[in-house]
Every structure is written in structure tokens, then in C-alpha cells.
Amino acid sequence: MVISLRFTSYRTTIRLKSCHDEPNKFCNFAAKITFMRIARFTFNPFSENTYLLYDESMECVIIDPGMTDEDEDSILFGFIRDEKLRPVKVLNTHCHIDHILGNASSCNTFDIKLYAHEKELQMLERAGAASLMWNVPYRESPLPHHYIQEGEQIHFGNTVLDVLFTPGHAPGHVVFVQHQEKVILGGDVLFKGSVGRVDLPGCNATDLVSSIQHKLYTLADDYVVYPGHGPETTIGDEKKHNAFVRSDWSGL
């Protein structure tokens, strides 16, 4: 099993707060240096990407924890402790077995809650059977503390993630978008040169195409997609080159 770490540091943004200009008076400026960082870990036999997002507050969210055992736990948790981060939420883009294997250990270790879409509850409740079918160890996930919805905002530290409802690969699939940094945590909707599977229970090819064309492809070309499997890509590259869903036809 290959476990890899990818660390991306985004540009630094300077936010200025100024007083109103007044004649013959100096205007005071308060500058705040902010950043958002993404750490990517690849876990489990499915080579699933688990993401850790954090900013200068040192608060972080864990997205789709895929750790199967204590050895994989120690890689993610060791990074969190070494960086002195404070996890505040676990977020699931969807609840297929490869994306939830580390839900329990993450929530229990850091005493934090799970956030997912309500339409993924049935999948989460059937995860034990899925683990037997795929022959992977499973530590029972807690149920969601909060059901995520389209248009909602997820807050941690000084960072805001916008939620887009993107069904197709899973009935309650969502993606998380950070507009300031033009980043999409995309789960299994859109990959580099490919798209999420539509041959699993609850999948719908028409919905997947609609999610990509009407939710993701409407974002600017320079938005970076961090998918649930494989390398990152950009919206512009996929609109031009993805043979499964182009921006000007139905695909699939």
C-alpha cells in the first residue's frame, strides 16, 4: 500500500482595514497576513485522497478521512500534532466506504463532529456491509452531527468553504469551494481526464453530467480541483480535454 503526502501552500493575501480619509490626518492601516494550506494524504487500498485544510489560525478541517488502521491514523494525526493544528470538523463529500474509513478515529481522537449531506445517511448506515464486500477493515463511523446543504458555508479559523450539491456519483455528494484561493475539494465528481463512477448503487449518470456542467464548469478556468483520487487538475483543462464531459455537450 502506497501512502503519500502532498503539501500545497497557497499565495499569501494581505487584507487591509483603513480609516476614512480625513484632511490633514494620517490614515492608520492594519495589515493581516493570511494563508490557507492543503495537505493531501493518500490512504487505503483504493488510493483515496484525504485532505487537511488549515489557515493561520491553526484550526483545520479533515475532509474524507480514509485511514484503515492505526498505522495510517498515525500519519495524519502525527502531521496534525507536529504542525500544532486544531481539528474542528470532519467533512465528507460523500459516504462511499473508501472516504469514511477514518471517520471514527478522527472524530474520537479529536472529539469533533461529522458533517455530511442527509442523502448520504443510508450509505453511511450500510458501510459495514460495504466493507465486507470490498474486504477492507471498518471502524463504525459516527452519524452526522450536521447535514450539509447546497449554499451553506463551512467556517474554520478565518476560512470559509462554500458547499455545492453535486449528485451523480452519489446521491448526496457535495463539493467544498474556497473562492478566494480558487480551490475545489471535489470528492469523486471530476478527475483529471475522467469523472466519477456511475455503476454503483445510488449513482446517476445524468445527474453527474449536470453537476459537472452546471456547478463545476461554471467556475473560472483557473480553479484547481483536488479530487478524491489521483492528481489535481483545473476547471479549464477539464473543459477542454475531458472526453467524458465537455462544456458544450452532454457526455457519458
Map each language-model feature to its residues.
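Ala/Thr-enriched low-complexity intrinsically disordered regions
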Residues: T8, T12-T13, A30-T34
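Residue-level marker for buried hydrophobic side chains located in beta-strands
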Residues: V61, L91, L114, I184-L185, ...
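Metallo-beta-lactamase
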Residues: M67-T68, A130, T159-L252
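Conserved beta-strand hairpin/beta-sheet module of binuclear metal-dependent hydrolase folds
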Residues: M36-E83, V175-G186
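Active-site HxH/HxHxD metal-binding segment of metal-dependent hydrolases
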Residues: M67-D73, F77-F156, K240-D248
